[in-house]
Amino acid sequence: MSQHKPVLIIGGSGFVGAYAARTLRKLHPAVPIAIGGRNLEKAEAIASEIGNAEAVVIDLTRRDLGLSAGKAFSAIAMFVYDNTLNALHYAQDNAVPYLSLSTGIHEIGPEVAIYAHKASAPFLMGSSWLGGAASLAIVHFARHFETVESIEIAALLDEHDMGGPAAEADFNRLTMVPNTMALADGKWHWTATGEQGRTVTSIDGRQVPGMTYSPFDVFSLPVTTGARTVRFDFALGETTSRHRGEPFSTEITIAISGRRRDGTSGRSRYEFVHPEGQAPVTALSVALAVERLLGLDGKAPAAPGLYFAESLIEADHAVERFKAFGARIAQAS
């Protein structure tokens, strides 16, 4: 029997949140889970499905989330946008590790201010692409380089793979901003989101109209890799698998430039593809984060601090897990 208190997944009855609950259950059958949401019936259905779980109603308008004083959790994973930040307040008030997935780069200030005021538990800022999956793969491949000069990331999300209503609302909110942040030659600057001519190349070579975007990878990777240029382009369109008449997938292409450990210099390309779309990748990113925050991997639990996925989770381990769960991650031919 697990000695851990339940892991609270707020939004756990939504499409990706439920996927994360199932993934965490698969990795750790004994860890209790609480499925939190506004609709008790939906939360109860997911809790019943995964087992060793309970359903709780969450009220984000209240600092106590509407929970009874006797409730306690080992960690909180936040799958919905919380414009009150009451879930983060609750986590800090109760010294509970917290993971947020829906905050934009232009919205992070209030979260950091709350954390700086009361840094009582670890806080994983998980709004990197697919919960940090892209950055974890980049750190894994960057180990082939002695120095990294630039990182270019291009994500192709299939238009049939938007997920549930909460995910669609997040997408609309995060992509309506007029400017996105990028690092070029060591200098931060804002770029027009709808910059003319931006395209994303699918893994079968098609040019898909895209836009600049700045998930948290853009400002975490310069720190973790030393890169002086980091850019992220995004497109919503037809993935290679669906173009072939198969179900949609999700695609991330990565280009790393710098001096390799074999003494050569140049640009290497890599591909990260999951044949079932973005949900299983994001879900596993969250499950690995919870695992590391709580020390479920046999190591000490994470200390209080601000973290990105690649500063918390061991990248090589994550890549192996992604592959085991169906992803293809490899250097491009």
Where are these regions (language model features)?
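Active-site-lining helix/loop region of Rossmann-like oxidoreductase modules
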Residues: 10, 14-18, 143-269
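Rossmann-fold NAD(P)-binding glycine/threonine-rich loop
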Residues: 102-122
